[in-house]
Amino acid sequence: MTNTTGVMPAPAAGGGFRLRYPVFAVIVAMMAYVVYHNERFIIDATNPIWNHYEPFKWWLLPHGLAGGCALVLAPLQFWESLRQRHTAVHRTIGTIYVIGVLILAPVGLYIQYQDEAQGAARSFTIETMIQSSTLVICTLFGLYFALRRQFTYHRQWMIRSYAVALTFFEIRVILGVFGLDHQPMDWHTLETVVWSCVASSVLVGDIANQIYESRLVSSRQVTRSARVAVAADD
């Protein structure tokens, strides 16, 4: 796999690459579900979940704002036309994403540590430390390669980073759809779901990278064949 110091060319807009549209649709659907199912308590001061969050409720504000910005804006970074035609916007959104990750990860770890007083196991705090560290490491690698203008590696690491970040939605969707998020919380079930999502997140990111690379190779082969055909006609 070669690296590049220029703007990454987009795969041809063939039918196969339109796989990105259902992927983005699934992400949007997860966002909508989590906002409706899990986050409505934000506008309902009488929701009993506030009793659980009371010891660390003010830490939820920076954690939620930073995480919301990162998760909502990140899909725009993978939109080819935006990335290639509006590089300043791409860099701005990328900066917001990196800052968001560097806020949400340590704050989330602190919140989970405080949650031990509510019955969460220390092993869950350790899991959150691994999850947060994985997210930060992938993001910082992506930033490092962006600063070095090695955009292939930058894209690969940012895809891994976002795959880890998406576990926020995946965990809540799985718990909600299968009715596992009832109160009082079964911490063993929750931790199992969280570990499963986190353990597979980088793998999911690498699968996405492989799909992108295979589409890119196919696009280059088609372009090369077309050029050869045109040259032969001339």
Task: Outline where the language-model segments fall.
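Alpha-helical membrane insertion/targeting regions
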Residues: 2-234
